[in-house]
Amino acid sequence: MGARASVLSGGKLDTWERIRLRPGGKKKYALKHLIWASRELERFTLNPGLLETSEGCKQIIGQLQPSIQTGSEEIRSLYNTVATLYCVHERIEVKDTKEAVEKMEEEQNKSKKKTQQAAADSSQVSQNYPIVQNLQGQMVHQAISPRTLNAWVKVIEEKAFSPEVIPMFSALSEGATPQDLNTMLNTVGGHQAAMQMLKETINDEAAEWDRLHPVHAGPVAPGQMREPRGSDIAGTTSTLQEQIAWMTSNPPIPVGEIYKRWIILGLNKIVRMYSPVSILDIRQGPKEPFRDYVDRFYKTLRAEQASQDVKNWMTETLLVQNANPDCKTILKALGPQATLEEMMTACQGVGGPGHKARVLAEAMSQVTGSATAVMMQRGNFKGPRKSIKCFNCGKEGHTAKNCRAPRKKGCWKCGREGHQMKDCTERQANFLREDLAFPQGKAGEFSSEQTRANSPTSRELRVWGGDNPLSETGAERQGTVSFSFPQITLWQRPLVTIKIGGQLKEALLDTGADDTVLEEINLPGKWKPKMIGGIGGFIKVRQYDQILIEICGYKAMGTVLVGPTPVNIIGRNLLTQIGCTLNFPISPIETVPVKLKPGMDGPKVKQWPLTEEKIKALTEICTEMEKEGKISRIGPENPYNTPIFAIKKKDSTKWRKLVDFRELNKRTQDFWEVQLGIPHPAGLKKKKSVTVLDVGDAYFSVPLDEDFRKYTAFTIPSINNETPGIRYQYNVLPQGWKGSPAIFQSSMTKILEPFRKQNPEIVIYQYMDDLYVGSDLEIGQHRTKIEELREHLLRWGFTTPDKKHQKEPPFLWMGYELHPDKWTVQPINLPEKESWTVNDIQKLVGKLNWASQIYAGIKVKQLCKLLRGTKALTEVVPLTEEAELELAENREILKEPVHGVYYDPSKDLIAELQKQGDGQWTYQIYQEPFKNLKTGKYARTRGAHTNDVKQLTEAVQKIATESIVIWGKTPKFKLPIQKETWETWWIEYWQATWIPEWEFVNTPPLVKLWYQLEKEPIIGAETFYVDGAANRETKLGKAGYVTDRGRQKVVPFTDTTNQKTELQAINLALQDSGLEVNIVTDSQYALGIIQAQPDKSESELVSQIIEQLIKKEKVYLAWVPAHKGIGGNEQVDKLVSQGIRKVLFLDGIDKAQEEHEKYHNNWRAMASDFNLPPVVAKEIVASCDKCQLKGEAMHGQVDCSPGIWQLDCTHLEGKVILVAVHVASGYIEAEVIPAETGQETAYFLLKLAGRWPVKVVHTDNGSNFTSATVKAACWWAGIKQEFGIPYNPQSQGVVESMNKELKKIIGQVRDQAEHLKTAVQMAVFIHNFKRKGGIGGYSAGERIIDIIATDIQTRELQKQIIKIQNFRVYYRDSRDPIWKGPAKLLWKGEGAVVIQDNSDIKVVPRRKVKIIRDYGKQMAGDDCVASRQDED
């Protein structure tokens, strides 16, 4: 004892006894802690004497540290004590244990760094296999040691892709090159599924690298290294020397570290799959055998301790959902009732070898056969427990029974005195409204006119008879239902009398309980012991099977548990037998069936993170909505989700829930909007009595189609993902969903229809939830009718809150203010601002447009001009002088309040229109002068060039349409245009349209036509033939004219177009002609503009032409077709085309060369894109030094030569499909083969070679492809065989993607064929001949034929070209008289030849070349392939 106590001496012991055990705690270290530590060390066979020195403490800590993570509490306490003791020895000042442990760790980290530094100084060679410097100073590679590889293999074998694998891989691959990393991956290549996932990640990252690091154009400078591509980093297209050079260059490119990072990304994905955090993460790997997947699935399930029911449900849903596509198809075909053994048998051989089959099948049969040990009384997926609320004082946390507050008088439910709550007869199935009454009958009875689809959302228990075996959800109970069944409201506990074993008992109907549990009762028959979990913990019960029980007069037989339960419970096992349902009274309206768009599934959008206060607000809102039956909780079986968020209400601290239904709206069927616009007060007839009502919670009163509810699912997340989110779905029409307005409007119309029929004297205007009710009844009678209407709506579940019930004028309705004999818009205030943003101006224009309905003369054209172009909402826009003036005028107009009157059907409508200038018009519609029904404005220009008459007709049509909508008839028009002007326009203008009856009103400014075009040529006037031409590339152009009197003129223009030059030519003719002129053009565009006689235009050029036309006395404009040999037209065409229009033979060569230098596209793409002959396109490729890599395809690119095919085996429905893809065209040949053997593969290959020219086959390293039989078949058929490179991004890419495509098509046609082999051939036919796209927009079948035919033609042409190449060409440039050459002849056309001089490819006209034979130096004769043309 003394020895142990002497660990610390005097001063140190005082320090020890001042240190607290916990931060802020009262207890401090004492001598007893040292004695305890000594004894513990002895127990762990450590020397207690080590405690006496700081060095000894350090040694103890070194021993204890590795055990802390997995050790017991005692070890942790011992570690803490020793750490504190170390600090005392070292005289480090600490206040408590926590601080001591932190100080200790700091010391350790410092010493560790020192050790590492010392190790680095003493040796320049890493422990693994980095790049090292040899004696000559060269950087050489020290190969990876077998010991390291062995360690890596053991890690994978022992840890099987658990999270520890990643740090171990990182440590073992320190300083590795890509080649080393690939060696490590190849040693564990047997894990096919994992390697496939890793390969996909590497491919993705390599592609991303290439995207972010594009290749620099041009050749690499001498002595400079090329930049690594994605496949170089992955070690597939780079040599070890290149990798070392990159890693050691200055600055270095750490290709090893980059590749290692990619592999770790892939390993992370694999770890997530093999060591999932939750059951939802357990997914089957791409090539993982189904049995291995099941094994992992159940291992995790067993760890989660779920009840057997939950496990069964997971097997049926999650196991199928998360299987790979091959297995999923099979599992779905088996149907929902398949056992686990059936599933595993069916999936045998799919995705890989079934090496665990027998063992696993036996294990699984034991798992599923054994009875579950723990049966939870309630489901595992319940939400948090609801807090108790006191009926008496209203506070949470206690019941009324235990309430200390003075007892409240009267009933706690209805508030009336004279009875207690348990005797209350008041019906309050009130889940949606403040006050829901059913005045026409007893609780739960609806009048006979109300038919209803019995939704399982009425919150009452309804028991259906045994003679009527219906489903639990009540899906079959459509239409009218008799309400004679017992209904039990949930305002009290649903207690009923039951009869069991000849005894009467009182029991609680509990839809939340799985089992029926009764307190001590003697029942006949055998029983077995069982444990069940309830709210208060576990209880022991006796289980009796096949017991008859009578509930509410209906008999059921099932399992009954007997034990010490606080209350008798009838659970779901018996309630479902008697057809008991839980119902909510939302609205007794029939639901409107809704579907998704064909071929679409529901939304699966992830919920984004939300702040804590938003989550709390949403939880409160949703709890309230759930109580009211608007939404219901759902389990994880619903795969759909829509994101939600919360915003604060305007001028309030309350939150509002918003659901982002954009994705669901895209997928939901389209609806026909019942109402096409909003009602207008000018169309209201004058009524004696008026009332305005508002329907409260409008959408939430209408039920949503049951089958559609699942698609409205949303999730409230938890803070820091503490628990799974709470999932809900809507039972009613959601706000923000596209179907809600249409369904609500049609439901409201149906409900109001009987009331409208019974009360024809009452006018009801309905727009969404706003109701305008008018009548000519006395106010007392009118209000009685209003109450009847409110009652009628209430019967259907719609409340009309008093708060929004307007009885006295002025009535605020739809943004209008209604008085008994007049109406106006609600007051409008235009803001005064120093600076205006785009958003401010948008709001301002909106207000002015709204005001223009009754305030005449409002203009917004100049304000709208400020908003042109794409501007940010917050961008400040300076007001132009015109806009400021317009705004000031509008302010003046709005100063005086203006009112409109109501419509009198006995009087005519009159519309008067005035021109305001600047293309703006104002109008008034009235029945009596100076008493406007409404006003408005028109300022739309339907084209760049217009005139007043055209605008006037457009305005009239707008007013006529508006009148038909509001009053059902067109008004008489008073227009500021003379009849003669109108007649002239209407007869001449081919686009003129009908306008209604009208009369002339002399309101200046009058509308007139400013000039007229003649119908016949003007005799004696000069005729101008005009034309214009422009070059699209250079944007240079010419315009001009030729006259019948020999005059001509051509003017050049820059930055122009063909259309502009045509108009420029007309402008020239008008400027240079007299007062009378004939103009002939070949431009339909120019003719169309001028024939419409515009008097204003947005185009400056057209405005100049209008000015010239107004000055003329007579103008005749005619059109002739271009290039048809018409005298003057042909002359002027030649004039303006010179040097502008250039028709060059093969003028795409330069562009093709430029594009090839940038993108190095293949000859076929150039031939297609630039319309070049294949030989010229191939020559461009041949003259490119980067594209000449020994005739092979460039690294990392798929070789698309015509004879190359890729082959691969894929699996579907337990069978093997051998797929061959013609790489260049995407054409497929596929067959179901009996077995994946070399014999079958060789036979398929010979069949393929017999149909198509096969030069090369590219396959993976599968045993069937590497077999001797296939090699023999390839040798016989003269086919070269190539194999894929491991981890090469493009190695088997074409056939892999075709496998997916083929399976997708098979899935689409599978139900049309009995056998898989038939479906495969159908899919091949569809792919080859019914799907078009890619180069040329062909189908794959057309493309392969085209490619093979082109190849044959090219070979033939090549033979001719070899002959042509025996000729040499001497040529002259346009301005240089000296003959150049000899050049090589590439192509001979009709008017030009294509030659190659050094590396330049040129197009030279035939008249400027001399073609001679190489040997003879004489001119080529007529018999030669390239006969000579006449020279200039």
Swiss-Prot record:
It comes from the Viruses. Keywords: Activation of host caspases by virus, AIDS, Aspartyl protease, Capsid protein, DNA integration, DNA recombination, DNA-binding, DNA-directed DNA polymerase, Endonuclease, Eukaryotic host gene expression shutoff by virus, Eukaryotic host translation shutoff by virus, Host cell membrane, Host cytoplasm, Host endosome, Host gene expression shutoff by virus, Host membrane, Host nucleus, Host-virus interaction, Hydrolase, Lipid-binding, Lipoprotein, Magnesium, Membrane, Metal-binding, Modulation of host cell apoptosis by virus, Multifunctional enzyme, Myristate, Nuclease, Nucleotidyltransferase, Phosphoprotein, Protease, Repeat, RNA-binding, RNA-directed DNA polymerase, Transferase, Viral genome integration, Viral nucleoprotein, Viral penetration into host nucleus, Viral release from host cell, Virion, Virion maturation, Virus entry into host cell, Zinc, Zinc-finger. The record marks G218, P219 as: Cis/trans isomerization of proline peptide bond. Residues 1367-1414 bind DNA. The modification Phosphotyrosine is found at Y129. Pfam families: Gag_p17 (PF00540), Gag_p24_C (PF19317), IN_DBD_C (PF00552), Integrase_Zn (PF02022), RNase_H (PF00075), rve (PF00665), RVP (PF00077), RVT_1 (PF00078). A motif (Tryptophan repeat motif) lies at residues 982-998. Zn(2+) binds at H1156, H1160, C1184, C1187. The record marks W985, W998 as: Essential for RT p66/p51 heterodimerization. A zinc finger (Integrase-type) spans 1147-1188. Residues 102-125 are annotated as: Disordered. The active site is at D510 (for protease activity). The record marks 129-130, 360-361, 374-375, 430-431, 438-439, 485-486, 584-585, 1024-1025, 1144-1145 as: Cleavage. Its EC number is 3.4.23.16, 2.7.7.49, 2.7.7.7, 3.1.26.13. Residues 12-19 are annotated as: Interaction with host AP3D1. Residues 186-224 are annotated as: Interaction with human PPIA/CYPA and NUP153. One of its GO terms (cellular component) is membrane. Residues 628-818 form the Reverse transcriptase domain. Residues 811-819 are annotated as: RT 'primer grip'. A zinc finger (CCHC-type) spans 388-405, 409-426. Mg(2+) 2 binds at D1027, E1062, D1082, D1133. Residues 8-43 are annotated as: Interaction with host CALM1. Mg(2+) 1 binds at D694, D769, D770. GO terms for molecular function: aspartic-type endopeptidase activity; DNA binding; DNA-directed DNA polymerase activity; exoribonuclease H activity; lipid binding; RNA stem-loop binding; RNA-directed DNA polymerase activity; RNA-DNA hybrid ribonuclease activity. PANTHER family: ENDOGENOUS RETROVIRUS GROUP K MEMBER POL PROTEIN, RNA-DIRECTED DNA POLYMERASE-RELATED. This is Gag-Pol polyprotein. It comes from Human immunodeficiency virus type 1 group M subtype D (isolate NDK) (HIV-1). The gene is gag-pol.
